[in-house]
Amino acid sequence: MVKREQWGSRIGLILAVAGNAIGLGNFLRFPVQAADHGGGAFMIPYMISLILLGIPLLWIEWALGRFGSKKGHGTAVAVFDYLWKNPVAKYIGLLGVLIPLAVVVYYTYIESWTLLYSFFSLIGKLPSTPVTENVSDYLKPFSHFLVEKTGQDASGLFLTPALETYIFFVITLLINLYILYRGVSAGIEKVAKYAMPLIFVMAIILMIRVFTLSSPDGRNFLDGLGFLWNPDFSALTNPKVWLAAAGQVFFTLSVGFGAILTYASYIKPKDDIALNGLAGASVNEFAEVILGGSIAIVASVIFFGIPATAMIASNGAFNLGFMALPAIFANIPYGEFFSFLWFLLLFFAGVTSSIALCQPAIAFLEDELGFSRQKSVLALGIFLFIAAHIPIFIKGALDEIDFWVGTFGLVVFALFEAVIFFWIYNSKEAWKELTRDNDIKIPYFFYYIMKYIAPGLLIIILISWSIEMLPSQLTKTDPGAWIGRIFIVILTIIGFLLIKAAWGNRNGRTHT
């Protein structure tokens, strides 16, 4: 087995874990979800979901990762196999490798858009806004720009992205692979130490600029902050707001991806996980709620008002970040610079997340198949380059893959993590494993949250999503949707075969 790497410093670990969580979702998805679900009406369920679902699942993944570090393994494949003496366990654990791997196939492509936009902002090639009071017409040039660059206006099965879009995707992929090639400490950790402070500096500069904006109607930043933070207790009876809030907590903390488990496997077996996990989550929440919410939402409320902001958010996940904000920046002094800063911030945030999503696959190749770091990254790079052509060129494939692995799959895997650790393995042993050698004491009431409440909430989310989304998803018959499904099936079969090969060469080294 290849000797496993370790983090070089505690601050590097915390920044890397925070970088894993701080991604495009913090600055693109959170503002859209909050604006679409009533601003302050969204924040109460969000905070409750963070305590009852996000933090407990985060600590569970940290504990699973530290458990894996004792055994010399960094993915749920082997960790589940140790915890549950059943041949099926390792195949369930495969979700913790396949989900982040499938997500990063399209995530790096979306990430590359931000690099393209930052470059076009710098050279002044983004669209200008028309003179109109109609919000839809105001944003139309930026909507057309995104459609044109990604080829979404194609009428048939195949998309026709612009050449520069493809070039920026290749550049983005190569940047990710270079960082991964350097390793955990010299690559991921080193990048996090530079990228995370830069993300915060850029976000604070943008937030300060947004707070100085005003509209002819007299709206200012206080209106935007009021929309986000004034509580609406009537929303507590709206199940859709709760589901949206719980879903956002999943995305923002990166639970259910398996990446936290893998990152935690590179700590020493007696290192703290409680404080490290909480510190990483706190950095992430500051980036999302304070910075992410104070840029896109506040700017949009100032320029367009609350009803129009909610309308923009309801029309798509990219509308605030890729359309409303650049349109706003196009109409302020030095707007090109602030637009460049915004998209560069998104790119850095995207990179720190995408390299984390790649790491479980690399850890699997290293730990279970004995690949070297370089060989693992090369194999991963070839796969990602080939597989990314599906979401780049096939209409409907990206949305289909995103639903099954980037939405539904996250909840399924997180449920397996909680059930296997606290029910199948042994809840008392799980609690002992989770609370040992920590710098802070985890309150005992979290034992009941992790054993009963968190799994119960996950089941409720799964049932609700199944009722609300599965019927329409399963009835899709367009070729792009089927290509996305076939891709997931083929990836799963390859994963099963690799596990079979790895365990076949183990000579009884594990439980199966």
Go through each PLM region and give its residues.
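Transmembrane helix-boundary motif of multi-pass solute transporters/channels
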Residues: 12-49, 258-261, 276-278, 282-285, ...
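Transmembrane alpha-helical segments of multi-pass small-molecule transport proteins
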Residues: 12-17, 47, 93-97, 128-181, ...
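Membrane-interface "cap" regions at the ends of multi-pass membrane proteins
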Residues: 1-28, 57-62, 66-94, 268-272, ...
